[in-house]
């Protein structure tokens, strides 16, 4: 009788363990899929490409997940910039504020390099927001020179307040 009871308990426990195992496998794969979408800084990415990565992500902010564009933008923010604008939840709040919300889900952008030196590049960025209004920004990226995994990567150090440019036709 005791052996039958133990056998019954084991058969009852095994499906629960199996379900937990399946849930864990699902979470591992779905989490790695989300992080695979985030591009990481590396020395091969040029200054203009940093801005393109950030703007492309902000253009589709909630794809593949909520605030993915803001998170992608955060990954290419210079550590000094992150200290001022972070942590990430504060950065999300800042981007969603009136000052920068036009970057979220914008329709298009143009990037024009206006200054370049050995370690700093400055661009004029014009975006057409989802309400078909134009805004201009000064966007600055710098090469990170400190030893570590970001060494020689171009990262955003500053984005100006937007300058309204009017509506499209």
What does each model-identified segment do?
Residues 46-62, 72, 76:
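Short, aromatic-enriched amphipathic alpha-helices that serve as compact interaction elements
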Residues 20-30:
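Bacterial N-terminal signal peptides
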Residues 113-169:
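Exposed beta-sheet edge and beta->alpha loop/turn motif
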Residues 41-43:
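TPR-adjacent "capping" and linker segments in tetratricopeptide-repeat scaffold/adaptor proteins
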Residues 34-38:
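Boundary at the C-terminal end of the N-terminal hydrophobic targeting segment
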Residues 4-21:
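Bacterial N-terminal signal peptides that target proteins for export
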Residues 64-120:
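Short solvent-exposed beta->alpha transition segments
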Residues 60-66, 147-148:
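Low-complexity, polar-biased intrinsically disordered regions enriched in Pro/Ser/Thr/Gly
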């Amino acid at each position: 009788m005791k052996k039958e009871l133990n056998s019954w308990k084991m058969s009852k426990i095994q499906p629960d363990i199996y379900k937990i195992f399946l849930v864990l496998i699902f979470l591992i794969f779905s989490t790695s899929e989300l992080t695979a979408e985030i591009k990481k800084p590396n020395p091969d990415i040029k200054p203009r490409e940093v801005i393109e990565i950030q703007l492309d992500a902000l253009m589709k902010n909630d794809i593949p997940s909520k605030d993915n564009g803001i998170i992608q933008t955060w990954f290419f923010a210079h550590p000094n910039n992150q200290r001022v604008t972070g942590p990430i939840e504060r950065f999300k709040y800042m981007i969603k504020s009136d000052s920068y919300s036009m970057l979220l889900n914008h329709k298009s952008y143009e990037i024009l390099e206006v200054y370049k030196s050995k370690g700093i590049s400055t661009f004029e960025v014009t975006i057409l927001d989802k309400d078909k209004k134009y805004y201009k920004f000064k966007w600055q990226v710098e090469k990170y020179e400190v030893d570590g995994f970001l060494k020689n990567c171009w990262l955003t150090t500053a984005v100006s307040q937007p300058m309204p440019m009017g509506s499209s036709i």
